[in-house]
C-alpha cells in the first residue's frame, strides 16, 4: 500500500497507515537469544513462581526416570526430556500443579568401568582389592566424584533445552538419604518373606564378572556352534529301545558337561528310526537306531548326511518318561556315571531341533524349572537332584565338568573360548556326535560390554514372584508379587494402550527378580545372613539392626557398610552370633525402581511434592512415568515390582512411552555410520526451540527420525509460525484494549474467526490432555498458516492498515487478533518455550512475567455459531474459484495484483446466490470490485470441478488507482481535498490530520 512518488512534493501516506510495528525480529537468532531467556527464568525463580501460583490445585507429578550420570546427552535424551517438559508445562496450563523434579541414576557398572579404565588400566595400575575396606571405600569415592561431574554436565545440557524443573534440588540415587531409603526398601522385602538367596542360573557377564538382569542385556546377531548328540538308552534294557539313542540338538555344546536330563513333550509324535545307509566316514553310522520327533526326523538325517533311513515304529510319548539314558560323556576322566532321565516339559516343541531338549539345570531357566519341579521324584528314583556348578565367574569350566576343567566358554575380552571344541572332540571320540553345524541367531549380550553373556548357576539374591507376601507377618494365599503387579497393570493408564499388553506379558512370564551384583559401586544388600549349607541363607530380621544401618546410611552414605568394623557396629549386641555380612550390591534397577520412595514420599527433601494423594488412594493427584518403550522391561518394570512388593500397588497412574530415534533413512544411529545427530550442535546452529518443535511434530509413540533434511523442514515450519506471531504482534501495536469490540457488534468475518478459535481451542485442549502433541503442532500450523495468514489476515490487511482510526471494523479485527494472539502464544508455550516467552513479554508486558505462568484459555464455546460457519463454507468455496481464476490471469500477465481485477461470478444455484447476498466479495477475494450474476456462465469462464454451479470471468477493474490503498475504484478523485485517494481513504486522512499527522 501507498507508493512513493518520484515527485518529492507528493504526499507521504505511509505515516497514515497502521502498518505492523514490533521489536519481535523476523530472524529468530535463537542460539543467542535463548540463553538470555534461561537466565531470566532463573532470576525470577520461575519454578518457584509456578509452584506458588498453582498452590491448591490437583497435582500432576511427572516422576523423572533417571538418566545415567555418564557422558554428555544424546538425541534420545533430548527427545525424552523435551517430551517430559511438554507434559509438565501443558498440564500446568490445563490447571494442575505440575511438578518436575529431575533425577539421576548414579550407581552401577558403567561408572565402575570408566573409573577402572581411566584411573587404573590406562595407567598400568592394579584395580583395588575390594576385600580391603579402605580400598573399597576409596574406590567408591572415585565413582561418586565421576557421577557427580557428569550429573552437573548433563544438568546444564538439559536446562539448555528449555526444561523447567527444580534443578537446584534434583534427586540422585547416590545421595545419602536415597541410599538409606533404598536399603529400607530392601529390608521390607526381607521382612515380608520375598527376599531370599538361592542358587539359580542367571545371565552372567564374564567380561564384567557379574550377574545381569534382563533389562541389562541386548539381543544381537551371534553365530553359535550347533551339535546333534546321541544319548544311549540304558532303560528299558531289553526290547526295541535297548539299542537306541535319544538325539538332542543344542547351540551351546559347552553346557553338555552340565547335562542332567532330557526333556520331551507328550504332545509331540515320536518315532524309532534306523539308519540304513550313510557314508563310511560319517559320524552317523549305518545301523544307528535313533529316537526323534517324526516331524523333524527328515531334517535331522539331512544335517547328519544320512543317505537312507527307515522308520521302525511310532513311540508313544506317554512311555518316554520311563526311559533313562547314559550321559554321552560317560567315562571321561572317570565322570558322568549318572543316569540321565527323560522329563515331560511344556517348553518342548517340534519347531526345530529333534523334539528333545538337552537339559542342564545350571544353565537355563526352563532347564532349572523342570529339574527342580521333578527333584523330589528323582531322589525317590535314586537320581541325585543336586545341580552342579560347571562354570565359574571367569567363564571357565570347573572340576565339576570332568575332563574340561579350565576350558573357557568366553575369555576375559568376551571372545569365544576353547570349551566348545573340547566338548565336541570328546563327543566324537565316544561316537556320540551325530552332526554339527553353525547357526546365526539372536543371542543376549551385555548392554555395556557388548559381549555375549552366559547362563550359569550361581548363588544370588532374589525377590520371589510367586511366594505369598507376609505383610505384618501374615501371608494371604495367592497374594504374590506377580498377582499384585498384574492387578496394578490393569488399573494403570498406558499411553499408547499397547504398552499394557507388552508389560503384562513380561510380568506374567518373568522369573524371580535377581537383585544381586558382584560389584563395588552401588547400594549394598545390607542384610546379615546365617548360612544353611545348601546355598540358601536365613536373613536376620531385626528392627534395631535395620535402624542402625539406615541411620548410618542417612548420615554417612552406604560407604558405612564397607568401613572397618561395620559388622560389629550394625549387629550391636548380636555381633557374637553367627551372622555374616553380605558383600553383594543391589541391581541398579532396584535403585531406580525405589525412586518413588525417596522422591514422591520424602517431603523433607522435596517439599514441592508434599501431601501427594493419588487417585488410587482416594485423592485427586496423578503420577506419570514417561520413558522409552524399552523401559517396559526396565524402569517401569522394576518400579512396578518394587512398589507392589512394598505398597501393594503401582507407583504410577499413567505410563507414557516413546520410541527410539533413528536417522532420516530409518537406520539406527551409530558413530561408525556417521549418522548421529548431536543435540548440542542443533542448539548451537538453530536453537533449542527447533529441537522442541521436531519432538512435538513427530509421532513419539513410534520410532522417530531426524537428520539434516528433517531439521530443514522443521526450521521452515518454525519460520512460518514465527512470522505469523510477528505479524500479530506488529498489528496489535495499534490496539487499545479499551476499544475492544463486543462479540455481538462484530462483522460476520470476525464472528466466524471466533467460531474457528472455539473449535481450535477444544481441539488443542483435548490433544494436550491426551498427550497428543503431534495433533497440537499439526493443527496449530494449519490454523495459523491456512485459516489465519492465508485467509483472515490476508482479507483484513486492507481494513487494518487503511481504515480510519475510528473504524469499528478495524477495532473489531484487532479485538479478534488480540484473542488469537493470546490463545496461540499460550497454546504454543509448551512446545516453543523460548519463542513464546520472547513474544509474550512484548505482547503483554503488563501481565504475568512469563507465559508459562498462565493457563490455557478457557472454553470459547460462547463464540460458536455452526450456521455461520456453514454459510462461510459456501463463501470460501466461491472464493477458491475466484482465486483460481486470478492465478491464471496473473500467470498470463493480464493482471499483476489482484486489486487490478473485477471478477464476475456466475452462480447457477439460487440458494447459493442468497448466501452471497450480503457478503462483500471484493473484500473477501481482495479485488477492487466484484459482480455476482445469476445463471449459467459463458463457455470460457473459469470453473473448479469440486465447486459445482460457480464460474468466474475476470475483467480489469474500472477506475483510478488509490494512491494510499492501491485499490482501483471509480470513486477515486471524488474528494476535492484528497483527489488521489478513495473516499474511505480521504476520511482516514482527515482523521489523521485531526490527530496532528499531516501528509
Swiss-Prot record:
Binding site for ATP: 671
One GO biological process term: isoleucyl-tRNA aminoacylation
Main location group: cytoplasm
Swiss-Prot/TrEMBL catalytic activity: tRNA(Ile) + L-isoleucine + ATP = L-isoleucyl-tRNA(Ile) + AMP + diphosphate
EC number: 6.1.1.5
RNA-binding keyword on record: no
One Gene Ontology term of the molecular function aspect: tRNA binding
Keyword Transmembrane helix recorded: no
Gene3D superfamilies given in the database record: 1.10.730.20, HUPs, Valyl/Leucyl/Isoleucyl-tRNA synthetase, editing domain
A Pfam family this chain is assigned to: tRNA-synt_1
UniProt motif 'KMSKS' region: location: 668-672
Protein task: Catalyzes the attachment of isoleucine to tRNA(Ile). As IleRS can inadvertently accommodate and process structurally similar amino acids such as valine, to avoid such errors it has two additional distinct tRNA(Ile)-dependent editing activities. One activity is designated as 'pretransfer' editing and involves the hydrolysis of activated Val-AMP. The other activity is designated 'posttransfer' editing and involves deacylation of mischarged Val-tRNA(Ile).
Family according to the record: Belongs to the class-I aminoacyl-tRNA synthetase family. IleS type 1 subfamily.
Subunit and interaction comment: Monomer.
Protein name: Isoleucine--tRNA ligase
Annotated source species: Nitrobacter winogradskyi (strain ATCC 25391 / DSM 10237 / CIP 104748 / NCIMB 11846 / Nb-255)
Amino acid at each position: 500500500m501507498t507508493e512513493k512518488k518520484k515527485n518529492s512534493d507528493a504526499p507521504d501516506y505511509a505515516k497514515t497507515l497502521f502498518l505492523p510495528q514490533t521489536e519481535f525480529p523476523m530472524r529468530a537468532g535463537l542460539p543467542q537469544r535463548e540463553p538470555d531467556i534461561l537466565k531470566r527464568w532463573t532470576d525470577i525463580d520461575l519454578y518457584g513462581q509456578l509452584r506458588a501460583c498453582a498452590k491448591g490445585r490437583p497435582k500432576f507429578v511427572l516422576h523423572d526416570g533417571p538418566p545415567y550420570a555418564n557422558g554428555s546427552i544424546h538425541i534420545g535424551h533430548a527427545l525424552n526430556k523435551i517430551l517430559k517438559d511438554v507434559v509438565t508445562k501443558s498440564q500446568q496450563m490445563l490447571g494442575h500443579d505440575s511438578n518436575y523434579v529431575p533425577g539421576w541414576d548414579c550407581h552401577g557398572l558403567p561408572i565402575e568401568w570408566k573409573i577402572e579404565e581411566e584411573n587404573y588400566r590406562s595407567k598400568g595400575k592394579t584395580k583395588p582389592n575390594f576385600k580391603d575396606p579402605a580400598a573399597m571405600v576409596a574406590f567408591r569415592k572415585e565413582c561418586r566424584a565421576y557421577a557427580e561431574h557428569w550429573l552437573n554436565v548433563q544438568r546444564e545440557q538439559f536446562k539448555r533445552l528449555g526444561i523447567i524443573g527444580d534443578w537446584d534440588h534434583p534427586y540422585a540415587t547416590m545421595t545419602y538419604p536415597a541410599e538409606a531409603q533404598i536399603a529400607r526398601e530392601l529390608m521390607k522385602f526381607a521382612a515380608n518373606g520375598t527376599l531370599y538367596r538361592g542358587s539359580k542360573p542367571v545371565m552372567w557377564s564374564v567380561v564384567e564378572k557379574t550377574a545381569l538382569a534382563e533389562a541389562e542385556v541386548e539381543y544381537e546377531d551371534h553365530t553359535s556352534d550347533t551339535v546333534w548328540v546321541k544319548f544311549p538308552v540304558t532303560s528299558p534294557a531289553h526290547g526295541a529301545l535297548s539299542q537306541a539313542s535319544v538325539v538332542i540338538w543344542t547351540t551351546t555344546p559347552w553346557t553338555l558337561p552340565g547335562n542332567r536330563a532330557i526333556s520331551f513333550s507328550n504332545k509331540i509324535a515320536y518315532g524309532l528310526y534306523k539308519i540304513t545307509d550313510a557314508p563310511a566316514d560319517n559320524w552317523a553310522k549305518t545301523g544307528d537306531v535313533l529316537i526323534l520327533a517324526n516331524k523333524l526326523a527328515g531334517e535331522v538325517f539331512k544335517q547328519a548326511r544320512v543317505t537312507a533311513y527307515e522308520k521302525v515304529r511310532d513311540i508313544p510319548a506317554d512311555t518316554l518318561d520311563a526311559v533313562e539314558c547314559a550321559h554321552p560323556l560317560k567315562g571321561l576322566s572317570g565322570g558322568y556315571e549318572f543316569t540321565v532321565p527323560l522329563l515331560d516339559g511344556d517348553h518342548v516343541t517340534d519347531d526345530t531341533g529333534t523334539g528333545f531338549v538337552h537339559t542342564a539345570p545350571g544353565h537355563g531357566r526352563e532347564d532349572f524349572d523342570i529339574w527342580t519341579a521333578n527333584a523330589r521324584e528323582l531322589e525317590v528314583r535314586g537320581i541325585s537332584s543336586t545341580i552342579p556348578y560347571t562354570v565359574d565367574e571367569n567363564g571357565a569350566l570347573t572340576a565339576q565338568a570332568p575332563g574340561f576343567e579350565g576350558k573357557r566358554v568366553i575369555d576375559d575380552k568376551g571372545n569365544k573360548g576353547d570349551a566348545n571344541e573340547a566338548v565336541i572332540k570328546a563327543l566324537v571320540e565316544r561316537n556320540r556326535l551325530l552332526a554339527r553345524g553353525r547357526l546365526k541367531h539372536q543371542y543376549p549380550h551385555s548392554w555395556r560390554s557388548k559381549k555375549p553373556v552366559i547362563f550359569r548357576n550361581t548363588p544370588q539374591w532374589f525377590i520371589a514372584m510367586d511366594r505369598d507376601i507376609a505383610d505384618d507377618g501374615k501371608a494371604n494365599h495367592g497374594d504374590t508379587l506377580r498377582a499384585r503387579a498384574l492387578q496394578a497393570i490393569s488399573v494403570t493408564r498406558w499411553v499408547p494402550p499397547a504398552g499394557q499388553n507388552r508389560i503384562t506379558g513380561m510380568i506374567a512370564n518373568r522369573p524371580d527378580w535377581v537383585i544381586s551384583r558382584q560389584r563395588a559401586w552401588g547400594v549394598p544388600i545390607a542384610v546379615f545372613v546365617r548360612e544353611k549349607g545348601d546355598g540358601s541363607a536365613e536373613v536376620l530380621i531385626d528392627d534395631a539392626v535395620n535402624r542402625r544401618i539406615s541411620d548410618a546410611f542417612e548420615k554417612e552414605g552406604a560407604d558405612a557398610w564397607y568401613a572397618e568394623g561395620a559388622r560389629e557396629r550394625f549387629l550391636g549386641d548380636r555381633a557374637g552370633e553367627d551372622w555374616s555380612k553380605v558383600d553383594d550390591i543391589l541391581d541398579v534397577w532396584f535403585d531406580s525402581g525405589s525412586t518413588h520412595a525417596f522422591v514422591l514420599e520424602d517431603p523433607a527433601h522435596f517439599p514441592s511434592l508434599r501431601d501427594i494423594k493419588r487417585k488410587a488412594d482416594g485423592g485427586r493427584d496423578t503420577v506419570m512415568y514417561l520413558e522409552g518403550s524399552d523401559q517396559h522391561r526396565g524402569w517401569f518394570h522394576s518400579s512396578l515390582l518394587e512398589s507392589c512388593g512394598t505398597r501393594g500397588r503401582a507407583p504410577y497412574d499413567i505410563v507414557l512411552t516413546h520410541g527410539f530415534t533413528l536417522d532420516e533413512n530409518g537406520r539406527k544411529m551409530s558413530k561408525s555410520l556417521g549418522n548421529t545427530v548431536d543435540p548440542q550442535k542443533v542448539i548451537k546452529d538453530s536453537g533449542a526451540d527447533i529441537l522442541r518443535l521436531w519432538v512435538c511434530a513427530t509421532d513419539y509413540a513410534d520410532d522417530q527420525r531426524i537428520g539434516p533434511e528433517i531439521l530443514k523442514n522443521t526450521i521452515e515450519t518454525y519460520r512460518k509460525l514465527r512470522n505469523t506471531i510477528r505479524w500479530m504482534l506488529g498489528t496489535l501495536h495499534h490496539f487499545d484494549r479499551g476499544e475492544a469490540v463486543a462479540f455481538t457488534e462484530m462483522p460476520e468475518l470476525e464472528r466466524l474467526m471466533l467460531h474457528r478459535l472455539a473449535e481450535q481451542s477444544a481441539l488443542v485442549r483435548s490433544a494436550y490432555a491426551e498427550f497428543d502433541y503431534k495433533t497440537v503442532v499439526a493443527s496449530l500450523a494449519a490454523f495459523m498458516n491456512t485459516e489465519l495468514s492465508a485467509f483472515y489476515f490476508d482479507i483484513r490487511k486492507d481494513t487494518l492498515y487503511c481504515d480510519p482510526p475510528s473504524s469499528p471494523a478495524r477495532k473489531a479485527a484487532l479485538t479478534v487478533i488480540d484473542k488469537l494472539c493470546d490463545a496461540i502464544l499460550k497454546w504454543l508455550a509448551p512446545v516453543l518455550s523460548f519463542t513464546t516467552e520472547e513474544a509474550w513479554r512484548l505482547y503483554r508486558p503488563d501481565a504475568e512475567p512469563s507465559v508459562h505462568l498462565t493457563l490455557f484459555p478457557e472454553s470459547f464455546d460462547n463464540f460458536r455459531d455452526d450456521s455461520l460457519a456453514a454459510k462461510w463454507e459456501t463463501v470460501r468455496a466461491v472464493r477458491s474459484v475466484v482465486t483460481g481464476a486470478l492465478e491464471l490471469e496473473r500467470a498470463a500477465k493480464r493482471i499483476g495484483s489482484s486489486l487490478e481485477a473485477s471478477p464476475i461470478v456466475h452462480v447457477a444455484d439460487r440458494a447459493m446466490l442468497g448466501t452471497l447476498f450480503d457478503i462483500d466479495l471484493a473484500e473477501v477475494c481482495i479485488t477492487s470490485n466484484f459482480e455476482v450474476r445469476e445463471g449459467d456462465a459463458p463457455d470460457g469462464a473459469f470453473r473448479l470441478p469440486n465447486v459445482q454451479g460457480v464460474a468466474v470471468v475476470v475483467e480489469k477493474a474500472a477506475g483510478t488507482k488509490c494512491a494510499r490503498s492501491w485499490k482501483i475504484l471509480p470513486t477515486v478523485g471524488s474528494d476535492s481535498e484528497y483527489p488521489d485517494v478513495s473516499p474511505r481513504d480521504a476520511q482516514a486522512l482527515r482523521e489523521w490530520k485531526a490527530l496532528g499527522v499531516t501528509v
